[in-house]
Structures are given as C-alpha cells and as structure tokens.
Amino acid sequence: MSLLLSNSALVGPKFRSSRISHASASLDIGLQRATSPQNASVATCFEETKGRIAKLFHKNELSVSTYDTAWVAMVPSPTSSEEPCFPACLNWLLENQCHDGSWARPHHHHMLKKDVLSSTLACILALKKWGVGEEQISRGLHFVELNFASATEKGQITPMGFDIIFPAMLDNARGLSLNLQLEPTTLNDLIYKRDLELKRCNQSNSAEKEVYWAHIAEGMGKLQDWESVMKYQRKNGSLFNSPSTTAAAFIALRNSDCLNYLYSAMNKFGSAVPAVYPLDIYSQLCLVDNLERLGISRFFSTEIQSVLDDTYRCWLDGDEEIFMDASTCALAFRTLRMNGYSVTSDSFTKAVQDCFSSSIPSHMRDVNTTLELYRASEIMLYPDEIELEKQHSRLRSLLEHELSSGSIQSSQLNAVVKHALDYPFYAILDRMAKKKTIEHYEFDDTRILKTSFCSPTFGNKDFLSLSVEDYNRCQAIHRKEFRELDRWFKETKLDELKFARQKYTYSYCTAAASFASPELSDARMSWAKNSVLIGIVDDLFDVKGSVEEKQNLIKLVELWDVDVSTQCCSQSVQIIFSALRSTICEIGDKGFKIQGRSITDHIIAIWLDVLYNMMKESEWAENKSVPTIDEYMKISHVSSGLGPVVLPSLYLVGPKLSQEMVNHSEYHSLFKLMSTCCRLLNDIRSYEREVEGGKPNALALYRVSSGGEMMMSKEAAISELERLIERQRRELMRTILEESVIPKCCKEIFGH
C-alpha cells in the first residue's frame, strides 16, 4: 500500500482556536488544552457552539440587500403610480443609512466599494422618487461624490452588470435633477466602459446577450426588450429569483406575477429584502457541505439527513431552485451522490452546459461557481458518463486558466482551487482533506451577484471554531494512541528486526487518517498494528527471509497453538509470529465484545491467504518464472497486504457483521476492487525497481501480454492501466455508496 502522508499532519501539533481567522497560522500548540483546568469551560463552549450551528438548520438567514431593497422601494402601488407599493422599504432606507452617508452592508470588504456606490445610488434614487429623506439624499450624494473614483478602480471587485447599471442610475439621477458633482475624467472612463460592455454584449451570441441583459434589466433603459425579459420569469413570478430585476420588470410592465413575488418576499422578510430569494436549498446545502468538509457533520447527523431527504425530493420534482441555478445544481448533485442517493448525471451536465451557453453568461460566472461545478463533475460512478467526463475536463481547463492568469484575487481561494486541481477527492485521505479545509477556511464567505450578500450558512466562525476544537480533541487521542503503538513496537521486539522497514509512524498515520473519530480507537490500533506487521512480513518474503523461514512462518500460523521457543527456525520468525499471534488474539477479543461471536479464526484465515500468495510471488521470483497478467493479478491483489489491514478493522467500527455478510459476494467484491486498484497503482510507481530486481510487475506483464508481436510502450501501457484503475475506482465508489447488505460505515472503509 503506497499512500503518501505527512506524519506531522496527523500526530503533530494541534490547531490553535483562540484566533481563527486564518487557521493555517495556528499549528504551534501542544497538548495543553487536554490537561488544562479550563477543560470544563472549553466543553461548555463546545456544546454552545454546536447549539448555535444546529439552529441554522431551522432558519435560513440572508443578509439584507440595500440595493434590492431600494429597487423594491421604487415600485409604485398598483392602484396609484404616485404612491409607493412598499412604504416599509422606504422607511427602512431612511433608518439604515450609515454614518458616512452610504448604504453599505455592515463590515463589508474594502474591495467592495463599487458595490457600496451602486447600493447607495439606488437608495438615493428611491428616496428622491417619492420625495422623502432630503437629508439622507444630501449625505448620500456627498458619499458618492467623495468615493466616485472607486467606480473605475481596477483593484476593486466589480459586481455583475455594474459597468452598465451604475451609469444608467447616474442618468436617472440627472433626470431627477439630483446635482452630482462628479470628477469628469472618472465619469468619461465610466461611460467608455459602459459603451465597451454594450458593444461586447452585442458581439456575443444572441442567447447569451439576451439572458445577461435580462439579469441587469434595471440598467438597460430604452435598450431593454421587456417582452424577451419575461421569457425568464419563473413559476414563483420572479426573474432569476432577484428582487431588484423583478421590481424593475413590474415598474416597466405592471406584471401581476412579479408583484405577487415581491409581496411574498416582503411578507417573509419584512421591510428589507435579500439579493436572492428564495435561496433555501442552496443555503442548507452550503451548511451541510461546510460541516462535512470540516469534519464535524457527525454532530448533526439527524439535521443533515432531513436536509438531504428534502433536497432529494426537490431533485426528483425538478425544482427550479435547483435546476435554474448552476451552483445549487452542482452542490445538490455532489452532496446527494456522495451520500448514496440515486441521481443521474444528465440533469447536472445539462446545468453545466447551460452555464456555459445561454443560461449563465460568462459575465456572471465566478471562480466559486466554476469550482463548485468542477467538484461535482468529479463524482463519476458509471462507466458511460461520457458527458460528465467532458465537462470535468472543460472545467479543469477553466480553473487552470484562472490560476495561471492570476485573476483569483483571494489568496485563500487561490489555494483552494490549486488543491482541488492537485488532489481529486478520492486521492486524499479524509483526515488530510479536513486539515486542508481548516487551513484554507474563510468564514466571511461573501457572494457577489449584482450586489454582495452573505449568510451564516455560507461561512461561519462557529464552523471553524468547532472544527478546530474537534480536530484538537482527536489529535490528543491520536497522540496517546501513537505512544501506545510505539510501546507495543518495542515490547514485541519488532524494533530488533533490522532488515525490516520501521514503518509504525506511517502505519499509524494511515490509521488515523482513515478512522479519525475518537470512539474508533480499537479500529485504528487494529489497522496500525496489522499495517506494521504486513510491512515486516513483506520484507521477510521480499528481502531477508530464507525459504525455510517463509515456510516456517506459514506453518506456525496454520498450527497456531505452538511453542515458539522450540518450533521457530530463527529469532526473526519467533519475533514476527509472536507479535502476529498476540495482535490477532487482542483484536479477536475486542471484536468478540462488539460482534458477540468469535472472529479470531477469520483473521487468521485472512493472514494465511496473504502468506500463501506472498509465497507464490516469492517462488516466481526465485525460479525466474513469468506469470501471465491474469495469474499475477489473481495472486497480487491479495499479496498487496490490504486484507489484514482493512478487513479486521471492519469488526471494530460498531455495526455487527454477520457471517452471512462476510461471505456475501459484495464483501469480496469490495475487497477485490480496492486491492486491485492499489496493486496497479503501486506497480506503476515501482515498475523500474521491480523489473530491475527480477520481480513480477503488473505494468511489465501488461506490456508483454497486450503488445502482440511487439511489446507495448511503457507510456501506452500506463495509459491502459490508468483507464482500468479508473473503471475499478468508479465501481468501488458506486458499490460503497449504494444501499446494500453491508453496513455503510463498514463499506466506507474500503474507500479510504
């Protein structure tokens, strides 16, 4: 088994949680918390944090959008064009101006000045339209004049459609006789950018132009074809679930469905509306995704199950909230698939195609959307998902371009994208993935459309705080277990076997990465000890051991109840067998308590199977025999040594594994798929060394067996084997995720 891990990541220093804005800077604290007298207060804080997070499942909080609220405030009454339809919005604008004269979101990012300018000007227009708030208008105009240079500043984030909408609102301001004293050069630059944007749109395909102009309808003025805009009206009466666009449409057309949507939003939110409504499905999926990626989902399993069930119902119903938004569709597809729900890729790939054709123009795509689509496209489970493969390749190219062009302004997001491209979800151990998420986590996860908006479900310091504390708790347990493993290694005298690789640190790291939860200590120790032993036995058969020693070890395991002082042919065999027997008995005793039946004989049989196959490989090498590729794979997927490492641990993770389950074809299929993938990956990497040493190797044998009269090139053979690995990996993932007789938590271990 060839897994590359950073040992320090799993048994090294802990994360500091006192300062959590950048968790990656907090890897310098030891075990103080585990022994601190403040443990009680830490535990209380831990539970309080869990409680706050749990409440998010029952209330979807969205930040107020001053921009959208201003546009809703401009809507006239359906019975009188001289009166506002939503006076509560006007009152909210009057009462919520900032001290500097702007209408900015609290604690907004310093790179969102364009957003603040746009929102402030929209609020000014709303107040002026209805002849109220003279003082607020004056202060707002002063803010716009003072900060007008930011409208063309390159370092600022540009909201969707800003270069068209903001100049249009300036025109409206002049039409309302608002006296704005604007710097001429900046104003000319802004007008030039607007004309350039309009020209670029006119040169794009008509469908993309049409949907983009519909999204920014409030900024198009006389250029807007309102009848074409209404093609995008949704069942809830909105245009793109956007209060501002829908408000502009009602002002232009007096469409009753638009008005009903606005009434619905006001009834839900009161006097101010968000930038997007509804956003319930996406918001809840973001919450689930955050908890899963940060490794704390197990604390909220009931709530998460409810979200997944609701989302699946919406998926089956073809809910617009999922399928009319690429990010929501991608997140739903990935989350549902990875949690075992049956969702085909057809609907998702259509959403991706729409994203890159007409439904979501390039003006509106951001890196977060592309990244979300890319992550979803990785979840390929079936051999015939050709379109999903194509979209995966396309999305990868787009993200690579974003990285190489340096267009990603956030260093944290840049690191997340790079990590996603470097490590497919299946190529990084779960514990390592959680650590990376903590390191790169930003809890101020602001989203940008025509204006900025956020929700505590998008990013939240409580998520990070709970994750860091949980990580540290697990780390403390892992360190204690590692000390126990170190002691065991020496007590069993395995450290005296100088020919063997001293791999117990590596072995424990793979165990901790596979079973992070504190309660799975027995499974971790079983995995780690058997991993150490299989490495030593492998070295005995491959490097040091004589034929007599190999045969003797096999005989000892077959007989089992033997006197090691008289029946071992060498000191090395005595040490190995003694450690092996005591470890199997220890695991058997622990397994008996959980399973209610003896599992020792099965563990012995697993070990014997490996030893027999290792002996066969040893004989091939000794006799310089060349097996066929089929003969080799039949033996080598067992001799890879994963059986003794993985299979005994299944008995220790909690659920009962009956004899019928262990004998079931699915159990054996899971093992064969996992071990075959690992064997092929290992043989590709170790090709040169094993060929030089005269040992059978899958890549070498495949070159001979598949090349006809001429040996296949190494590169071509690697490509063929990688395709085979990918097919096997998909089948393995599919088998793990599908409902079956084997408990899910046991099946998931085969995917580690």
UniProtKB/Swiss-Prot annotation:
It comes from the Eukaryota. Its main location: plastid. Highly expressed in leaves. Mg(2+) 2 binds at residues 538, 542. Mg(2+) 1 binds at residues 538, 542. Residues 1-28 form a transit peptide. A motif (DDXXD motif) lies at residues 538-542. Abietane diterpenoids (e.g. miltiradiene, abietatriene and ferruginol) accumulate specifically in the periderm of roots. The ent-kaurene diterpenoid oridonin, main constituent of Isodon rubescens, accumulates in leaves. This is Kaurene synthase like 2, chloroplastic. It comes from Isodon rubescens. The gene is KSL2.
